[in-house]
A protein has these predicted regions:
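Mobile-element integrase/transposase regions
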Residues: 148-181, 186-199
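The DNA-recognition helices of helix-turn-helix-type DNA-binding domains
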Residues: 129, 140-144, 216, 251, ...
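A structural signal for short, well-ordered beta-strand segments and their strand-loop junctions
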Residues: 122, 157, 213, 233-235
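Short, positively charged, Gly/Tyr-enriched micro-motifs
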Residues: 48-167, 207, 222, 354-355
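Active-site beta-loop-alpha junctions of metal-dependent nucleic acid enzymes
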Residues: 99-101, 135, 182-205, 211
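Short, surface-exposed amphipathic charged segments that create phosphate/polyanion-binding patches used
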Residues: 245-256
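Acidic/histidine-rich catalytic cores and adjacent linkers
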Residues: 37, 41, 46, 52-53, ...
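Short, conserved DNA-binding cores of transcription-related domains
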Residues: 1-88
C-alpha cells in the first residue's frame, strides 16, 4: 500500500503518519502518527496554554474510524509538559477527549448510530461491548450539551412518570418554552424536587421563573412554594380532566352494580365510550350513548359535567372563570353523584392554582409531549438505569426533531 494513500486515510489537521503496518489476517491497519510542525507546541490539558517544556512522553493506542473493512488503530505520541499554571500535565490532543481510547470522530459515529438504533445493534456493528457504546454515546452527548447556549427559564413543567418495579416514579422537570426536559430524578417526593433546586437551579436564576405547570400532588407544590415563592403554580389541565374522567368511570361502576338485568347489560362494555369526549365520537358511538343516557340519567349527568368542565380553560379573565367554576360546583349539590362531589372538594382545595391559567397561559400540551418522548425512549432502550444518560438522549432527540423541517 503506497505511503500517500496511508497518509490520506488519517486526515487529522496538524498530524501526519511516519510509520504504518497492515495485518491482512485480521484486516487491521496500525498508523504511527505525530505532529508535523517543525517545532511543535504542546497545549496543557488543564488551561490550554501552549508550551515546549516537556516532562516525558509515551505512546497511546487509540481506535479510529475504519477504512472500508479494515479496522484502523492510531499510535500517537502523548506528552506530559511542565505548565507554569498547572504544573506537570498531559498535553491536550484536539481529536482525543482526555484519556479516551477512541478518537472523537469515532465516538461521534457511534453516537450517531445510537440515535437510530438500540445499543445492542450498535455494539454488534462496531464490535464493542454494550457498556462501552453507552459510555461513548454519553460522552458525545455531554460535549454536545456543554456547547449549547443556555435557554431562558421562565416557564417550568413538573410531572412524574410511572416506571414500575424498582424506582417506581421518575420526576421530570421541563422547560416549557423549548419543550425539552432539563432534569430527571428518582421518586416523586418533596425531597426529589428539593434536590433539583439544589443541583440545577441556583438562586440567581430562580427569580426569572414566572409560572410552573404541575399536577395537584401536594409534595411538589410544597417544594415549589418554598423555592419559588414569587412564581404562579398552574395546575395541569389534563390532570384535572383525568380526575373528572375517573369520576365518570367510578359513577359507571356504581351504576353497573346498582342495576340488574337488562339495565346492567346496557352499561356493560361502555367504559371507553364514556371516557371519550363527545367531539371525538362517530355517529354510531353517539347513538349508542344516547340510548344509554335515555335509560340512565346519572351517567348522562356525569358525562355532561365532565364535558362542561373542559370549558373552564377557554376563559381569559379570572373573574369569569371563577364564576363558571362556582356555578359548576353548585350544580353538584343537586346531583346524587358521590364521585363528582369528591371531585368538587378536590377542585375547591386547588381553586387558585387552576385559575392561575388566566394569568399565565402555560402550554399544557408540551408537558404531555415531553413525557411521551421519555416513555418512547424508555421503550426503545428497554429501560435506563443512568438517569443522566436518559436526560441527554431525550434532549438530543427533542432538539433534532425541532430542527427538522415540517412535512
Amino acid at each position: 500500500m503506497p505511503d500517500a494513500i496511508v497518509a490520506r486515510i488519517l486526515r487529522l489537521p496538524g498530524y501526519g503518519v511516519y510509520a504504518w503496518e497492515a495485518t491482512d489476517a485480521t484486516s487491521t491497519l496500525t498508523l504511527w502518527v505525530r505532529q508535523t510542525a517543525p517545532e511543535p507546541a504542546y497545549r496543557c490539558g488543564g488551561c490550554g496554554q501552549a508550551g515546549r517544556d516537556l516532562h516525558s512522553w509515551t505512546e497511546r493506542r487509540v481506535r479510529d474510524l475504519p477504512w472500508g473493512t479494515w479496522t484502523v488503530w492510531l499510535v500517537v505520541e502523548g506528552h506530559r509538559l511542565r505548565c507554569p499554571r498547572c504544573g506537570v500535565r498531559t498535553e491536550r490532543i484536539p481529536w482525543l477527549a482526555g484519556k479516551a481510547r477512541y478518537t472523537a470522530r469515532f465516538e461521534a459515529a457511534v453516537a450517531q448510530d445510537c440515535e437510530q438504533a438500540p445499543v445492542s445493534r450498535v455494539a454488534g456493528k462496531w464490535g464493542l461491548p454494550g457498556e462501552t457504546v453507552r459510555r461513548l454515546d454519553k460522552r458525545v452527548l455531554r460535549r454536545w450539551a456543554a456547547g449549547r447556549p443556555r435557554a431562558p427559564l421562565r416557564y417550568l413543567g413538573v410531572d412524574e412518570i410511572f416506571l414500575g418495579r424498582g424506582v417506581k416514579f421518575l420526576t421530570v422537570v421541563s422547560n416549557l418554552e423549548t419543550g425539552e426536559p432539563i432534569w430527571v430524578g428518582p421518586d416523586r417526593k418533596r425531597e426529589t424536587l428539593d434536590r433539583y433546586f439544589a443541583e440545577a437551579l441556583p438562586r440567581r436564576r430562580r427569580r426569572f421563573v414566572r409560572a410552573v405547570c404541575v399536577d395537584m400532588w401536594e409534595p411538589f407544590a410544597q417544594s415549589l412554594r418554598w423555592h419559588l415563592p414569587h412564581a404562579r403554580l398552574v395546575y395541569d389541565k389534563f390532570h384535572v380532566l383525568r380526575h373528572a374522567s375517573e369520576a365518570v368511570d367510578e359513577t359507571r361502576r356504581a351504576e353497573f352494580f346498582r342495576k340488574r338485568g337488562e339495565a346492567r347489560a346496557l352499561v356493560r362494555g361502555k367504559r371507553w365510550l364514556l371516557l371519550r369526549s363527545w367531539t371525538h365520537l362517530d355517529r354510531e358511538d353517539r347513538q349508542t350513548l344516547r340510548e344509554l343516557f335515555a335509560l340512565n340519567r346519572r351517567l348522562a349527568k356525569a358525562y355532561l359535567l365532565r364535558d362542561q368542565l373542559g370549558q373552564l380553560w377557554s376563559y381569559r379573565a379570572e373573574g369569569w372563570a371563577r364564576r363558571f367554576l362556582s356555578t359548576w360546583l353548585r350544580a353538584l349539590r343537586w346531583q346524587r353523584l358521590p364521585a363528582f362531589q369528591k371531585l368538587g372538594r378536590l377542585l375547591t382545595r386547588h381553586l387558585d392554582g387552576i385559575l392561575n391559567y388566566c394569568h399565565e397561559k402555560v402550554p399544557f400540551g408540551k408537558v404531555e409531549a415531553i413525557n411521551g418522548n421519555i416513555r418512547a425512549m424508555l421503550r426503545r432502550g428497554r429501560g435506563y438505569r443512568d438517569h443522566e444518560y436518559l436526560l441527554l438522549k431525550v434532549q438530543r432527540a427533542t432538539a433534532t426533531r425541532r430542527l427538522q423541517p415540517a412535512a
